[in-house]
């Protein structure tokens, strides 16, 4: 990481200068102007966080923090400790922590919609960016700001409408997000020549705009490809998840809205080394705008080894249901699991690159299902697989983690409420993941993170190096 800089008061004032969009929003909002905005709070915390990094590097900058084996080099850099990611840390035994807080703690502490039980993703965005749990008022304000920024440019609507209906929804989402580069305040400011200390303020503006517009873009893709209907207007007094659910056509189903709040919250962030998070960071390190950076991350998320896993789980469960019918006995499930493994296939939704216990994101979804759809046949099947699969996988002996991950459950929940188009599920994931990766992109620009540039060698060079060791 490049040396970080101290931001003076003038730079901070410049970074939080209101754009015309913000000015209009501030004038229109009906809540107290005394409430500190997210941008103001981040700016206030920034000097202390910069000093923390400077002190860490000054005292420990020359220390060796990891050892790398050749297997790791050839194994996808698995487990190499070389990235800075402030929002979350993944522990193999207890799962993800968002700014030090577990998923159950986030479910308890983060503000909720009136009458709701699940946390609002707006609150998690605030937590990821600042490290602080926001107040209910701060979350309401953030909901209102995202709603105020949600209008999608006409040329983006026309671009989506002209896509072939059989073009994969993720390709359409990436296309639309890339095209939003045309609206980038960061790109315009950079082209004019701005001080590096101002980068983060423009990155923040683009990030807020992108997050605000994603549900409407995603819903337009859904309506065009699957429903042929119109996208409902954003209701300015409603939260982010309600508006997304309503634009998808599920706004009247309170349980689905609650599910979407949970889904968007728990899929946001999972450390910085996964493909979508790392790609966003990598592209952003070249000073590409948040639009181009997130579009690149979405392309990574679209890969079958990353964001398509819940589709594979759902397909596998559907195949199992056809074979075993209503027989959910231990014997029937065990036989099907062994048939899958003996055929050289994996059990989708089980195992994880880091985790060695049940994914707490799975547990959160299971708890939701137990409360809202305990009699659903597919949930009952998922529950039986959860009961039996770890034992079978352990006996099989070829996995380090025989427990379910987040993908083992989400498809069944979405199917229950009528969102049955499995090849759209990654779009939901993408909307959520943007909320998780953009806080780090803002932080990167605020602390002066450099362009990423690791060293590479050919196999012949590695042979030469290893012979000398």
Swiss-Prot record:
Something else known: Citrate synthase is found in nearly all cells capable of oxidative metabolism.
Protein name: Citrate synthase, mitochondrial
Pfam families: Citrate_synt (PF00285)
Principal EC category: transferase
GO cellular component: mitochondrial matrix
Family: Belongs to the citrate synthase family.
Active-site feature positions: 352
Top-level taxon of the source organism: Eukaryota
Classification via PROSITE patterns: CITRATE_SYNTHASE
Annotated localization: Mitochondrion matrix
Segments crossing the lipid bilayer: none
Keywords from the named record: Mitochondrion, Transferase, Transit peptide, Tricarboxylic acid cycle
Transit peptide: 1-33
EC number: 2.3.3.16
Catalytic activity field: oxaloacetate + acetyl-CoA + H2O = citrate + CoA + H(+)
Metabolic or biological pathway, per its Swiss-Prot or TrEMBL entry: Carbohydrate metabolism; tricarboxylic acid cycle; isocitrate from oxaloacetate: step 1/2
GO molecular function, one term: citrate (Si)-synthase activity
Primary location class: mitochondrion
Gene3D superfamilies recorded: Citrate Synthase, domain 1, Cytochrome P450-Terp, domain 2
Swiss-Prot/TrEMBL GO biological process terms: carbohydrate metabolic process; citrate metabolic process; tricarboxylic acid cycle
């Amino acid at each position: 990481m490049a040396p970080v800089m101290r931001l003076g008061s003038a730079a901070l004032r410049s970074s939080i200068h209101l754009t015309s969009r913000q000015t209009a929003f501030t004038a229109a909002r009906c809540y107290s102007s005394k409430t500190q905005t997210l941008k103001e709070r981040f700016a206030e915390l920034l000097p202390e966080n910069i000093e923390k990094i400077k002190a860490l590097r000054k005292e420990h900058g020359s220390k060796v923090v990891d050892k790398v084996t050749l297997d790791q080099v050839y194994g996808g850099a698995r487990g190499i400790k070389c990235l800075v990611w402030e929002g979350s840390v993944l522990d193999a035994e207890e799962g993800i922590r968002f700014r030090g807080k577990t998923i159950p703690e986030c479910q308890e502490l983060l503000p909720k919609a009136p009458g709701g039980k699940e946390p609002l993703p707006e609150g998690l965005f605030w937590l990821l960016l600042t490290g602080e749990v926001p107040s209910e008022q701060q979350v309401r304000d953030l909901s209102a700001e995202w709603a105020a920024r949600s209008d999608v440019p006409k040329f983006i609507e026309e671009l989506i409408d002209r896509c072939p209906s059989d073009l994969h929804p993720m390709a359409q989402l990436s296309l639309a997000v890339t095209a939003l580069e045309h609206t980038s305040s960061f790109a315009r400011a950079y082209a004019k020549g701005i001080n590096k200390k101002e980068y983060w303020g423009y990155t923040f503006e683009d990030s807020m705009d992108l997050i605000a517009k994603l549900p409407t873009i995603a819903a337009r893709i859904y309506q065009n490809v699957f429903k042929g209907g119109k996208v409902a207007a954003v209701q300015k007094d409603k939260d982010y998840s309600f508006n997304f659910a309503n634009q998808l056509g599920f706004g009247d189903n309170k349980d689905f809205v609650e599910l979407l709040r949970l889904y968007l919250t728990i899929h946001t962030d999972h450390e910085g080394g996964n493909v979508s998070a790392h790609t966003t960071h990598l592209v952003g390190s070249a000073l590409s705008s948040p639009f181009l950076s997130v579009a690149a991350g979405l392309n990574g998320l679209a890969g079958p080894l990353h964001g398509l896993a819940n589709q594979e789980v759902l397909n596998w469960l559907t195949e199992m249901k056809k074979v075993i019918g209503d027989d959910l006995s231990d014997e029937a499930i065990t036989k099907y699991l062994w048939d899958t493994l003996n055929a050289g296939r994996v059990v989708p939704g089980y195992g994880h690159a880091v985790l060695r216990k049940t994914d707490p994101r799975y547990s959160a979804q299971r708890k939701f299902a137990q409360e809202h759809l305990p009699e659903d046949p597919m949930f009952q099947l998922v529950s039986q697989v959860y009961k039996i699969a770890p034992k079978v996988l352990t006996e099989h002996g070829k996995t380090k983690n025989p427990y379910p991950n987040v993908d083992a459950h989400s498809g069944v929940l979405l199917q229950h409420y009528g969102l049955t188009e499995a090849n759209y599920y990654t779009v939901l994931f993408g909307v959520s993941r943007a909320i998780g990766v953009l806080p780090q992109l803002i932080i990167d620009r605020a602390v002066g993170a450099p362009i990423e540039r690791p060293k590479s060698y050919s196999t012949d060079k590695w042979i030469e190096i290893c012979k000398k060791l």
